[in-house]
Amino acid sequence: MDHMLPSPYNIPGIGTPLHQPEEDQQILPNAMQQQQLQQQQSQAQPSLAALGSSPIVGFGAIMGTPQRSMHTYAPTASYATPQQMMQPQTPQNMMSPMIAAGNLSSQQMLSQASPAPMTPLTPLSADPGILPQLQNIVSTVNLDCKLDLKKIALHARNAEYNPKRFAAVIMRIREPRTTALIFSSGKMVCTGAKSEEDSRLAARKYARIIQKLGFTAKFLDFKIQNMVGSCDVKFPIRLEGLVLTHGQFSSYEPELFPGLIYRMVKPRIVLLIFVSGKVVLTGAKVREEIYEAFDNIYPILKSFKKQ
């Protein structure tokens, strides 16, 4: 064996180690990163021993790896906190502010859209635009003295007296535009006013005129006896069906009178209802009775609306 010629091929023996490049000649992937990592680990060993932490946790703390805190924080979509900017931008993190904002906006919308406690539907709330208007107020007053109607008719302006036709002086004034019926007993009736204040003012003016004629007239027991209001419901009404359904309260004779007469029990009001939708309310002592009667009759009229 020792005298054999050397082979042209360098075949190593069994115990001959393979030729390995030197350590500084080896080509390793990510050599620079690993070298830096080893240096940082060697520098971190004393601090790790002092902290008593594991190398991974200590290395992460030294390298500044972002750690999630245990407390929860609900970010808004309007701005990003420094902690959010340091966290890795994963799709979940990027979507979380939008989801939180969406939940917040949906809660606000639900709170706004939640209905308020509903009240029972009343005729006034069903159509608040319709309000009866006062057309005439009849009031009475006691002048508390005997009157000479011929003297009043001769000396007063805008006064007429025909005892064969009517046993009272009819006197008119322009403001408020009203008419007075003056009786010899000292009683007076004032009609034509559109409001309670105008009716009282007109009655005082008539009493003052009679005082100027030489009578000791006073102003006692002024009282409103009747109020008349009217309104339009703006739709035609089936009066035949109304009188059949509410026969105990109403009467309808189109050959005698074109309107249906409806006598309401409470309030004690008489209504004249026409097929055109016009309604006249009379018999009230205060205007609230007019409004209450219309509130009661409006849903009935709406149920008999012509199609």
From Swiss-Prot:
Chief location bin: nucleus
PROSITE patterns from the UniProt entry: TFIID
Sequence repeat segments: 134-210, 224-301
Region Disordered: start-end pairs: 1-21
Alphabetical list of Pfam families matching this protein: TBP (PF00352)
Compartments it resides in: Nucleus
Gene Ontology MF, one: RNA polymerase III general transcription initiation factor activity
Superkingdom per UniProt: Eukaryota
Entry keywords, A to Z: DNA-binding, Nucleus, Repeat, Transcription
GO biological process: DNA-templated transcription initiation; transcription by RNA polymerase II; transcription by RNA polymerase III
Recorded GO CC terms: nucleus; transcription factor TFIID complex
Protein family membership: Belongs to the TBP family.
Functional note: General transcription factor that functions at the core of the DNA-binding multiprotein factor TFIID. Binding of TFIID to the TATA box is the initial transcriptional step of the pre-initiation complex (PIC), playing a role in the activation of eukaryotic genes transcribed by RNA polymerase II.
Quaternary structure annotation from Swiss-Prot or TrEMBL: Belongs to the TFIID complex together with the TBP-associated factors (TAFs). Binds DNA as monomer.
Protein name in UniProt: TATA-box-binding protein
